Amino acid sequence: MEQIVEWLTLSKHTVVLTGAGMSTESGLADFRSKSGWWQQIDPRTVATTEALTSNYALFQQFYAARIQALEDVKPHDGHFILTNWQRRGLIQHIATQNVDGLHTLAGSDNVDELHGSIRSVRCQKCGQAAEMQHFLAKEACPCGGKLRPNVVLFGENLPQGAWNHTLSHMKAAQLVIVIGTSLEVYPVSQLPHMTNGKTVYINLESGQSHFDLTIEGKAGETLKIIDALLKRDTI
């Protein structure tokens, strides 16, 4: 822990990349653990452009359940710690694979949501923004198109603006902190390789050998320990 505190204090450009493990402490299921979404449902049957086109009833049911699961979910201490670090100038950029919007709800600025956001909806046919209640009510767009959340489905490209913005920060980073992701999904899995800076991996399961420092633990709990050490050193 002392090592990351030193690096975080000395770094002039720090980037944080988060995954599903960042959200589990807020009560959301992750995807790849034994109790995660993908153990219950084959992603190839629901989170794809094919499902949107040919099995819309299942697609809508799956995403409606995920949207409704967010109703009482709030950011945890770890989200607020990252916001505080950002405001103090300790970190310069936050990117996330999560679609839940919890970083933004915690007050973080200019978060790049690399896999989109489940908190907004659009028409697949005309691209027009739509109201969430219309999607939940299984309504179609006035043009006749199918409504869908603004998430990146399997088979779709990442939002180019968010990707390019994060990539530029990665290349400039002196320190990259990866939190709560197994780094199994391409191309986000490649981002930590794009930096010449120090790299830190925080996750319940280690599984990553190419990082300069690996810390096994829950995201929020680990961030609270690091934050306490930072505060101790600044007293």
Where are these regions (language model features)?
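Conserved catalytic core of sirtuin-type NAD+-dependent deacylases
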Residues: 1-235
